[in-house]
Amino acid sequence: PIAGSMVLAAILLKLGGYGIIRMMQVLPTTKTEMFLPFLVLALWGAILANLTCLQQTDLKSLIAYSSISHMGLVVAAIIIQTPWGLSGAMALMVAHGFTSSSLFCLANTTYERTHTRILILTRGFHNILPMATTWWLLANLLNIATPPSMNFTGELLIMSALFNWCPTTIILLGLSMLITASYSLHMFLSTQMGPTALSNQTAPMHSREHLLITLHLIPLMLISMKPELVI
């Protein structure tokens, strides 16, 4: 069910990140070197989740693995226990909560019309539902973390904190962000561009669907203008 996916991606997954932040306050801040294996594991996990996204044919699975890869960055930022790392983790959790939930919502609008989640069978929607294509483009740009979005602020803070702590992490971070951009563009092009595979008539997007996406993206854009509300 779509509601379950949206709540899981937007709230429950981020509650895990919040739990890690609370737990880290109990542990010593002076010996962050002991957390190095966990940090490498978190970043490597993010890269593996991104690579899994690239080979997905199921739209919903792709978005779910995308959430996991972003949480890998969040965990890595929390582990080093610096103010910038924690601020970046909070910013990315809030921003990606809105983004992944809106992507799940868009995936459901596509599924309701095509009755399939296979990427190659949902193509050609830019001719049929141009407004939905606009929403897909905005959501994917936010997923890539294009400036001046909150996603970009969060990832920039995380990158700065990790690079300051250990310059070698920039290789893993850079690779992760490159693959994120690749699968996001792949998802957009696969679902929206090319000739349509549909033979029957497609129902237009309902006002409630437009409202649902708007209520995800507008608050995120407003928070992006005033990030001190979160970080």
Swiss-Prot record:
Domain of life: Eukaryota
One annotated GO biological process: electron transport coupled proton transport
Membrane topology note: Multi-pass membrane protein
EC number per UniProt: 7.1.1.2
Transmembrane segments: 1-21, 34-54, 63-85, 89-111, 128-148, 156-176
First-listed, main subcellular location of the protein, grouped into a coarse class: mitochondrion
One cellular-component annotation, GO: mitochondrial membrane
GO molecular function terms listed in the Swiss-Prot or TrEMBL record: NADH dehydrogenase (ubiquinone) activity; ubiquinone binding
Pfam short name (any one): Proton_antipo_M
Keywords: Electron transport, Membrane, Mitochondrion, NAD, Respiratory chain, Translocase, Transmembrane, Transmembrane helix, Transport, Ubiquinone
Cleaved signal peptide residues: none
Localisation: Mitochondrion membrane
Class of enzymatic activity (EC top level): translocase
Catalytic activity: a ubiquinone + NADH + 5 H(+)(in) = a ubiquinol + NAD(+) + 4 H(+)(out)
Family: Belongs to the complex I subunit 4 family.
PANTHER family: NADH-UBIQUINONE OXIDOREDUCTASE CHAIN 4
Its job: Core subunit of the mitochondrial membrane respiratory chain NADH dehydrogenase (Complex I) that is believed to belong to the minimal assembly required for catalysis. Complex I functions in the transfer of electrons from NADH to the respiratory chain. The immediate electron acceptor for the enzyme is believed to be ubiquinone.
Protein name per Swiss-Prot or TrEMBL: NADH-ubiquinone oxidoreductase chain 4
Organism: Bothriechis lateralis (Side-striped palm pitviper)
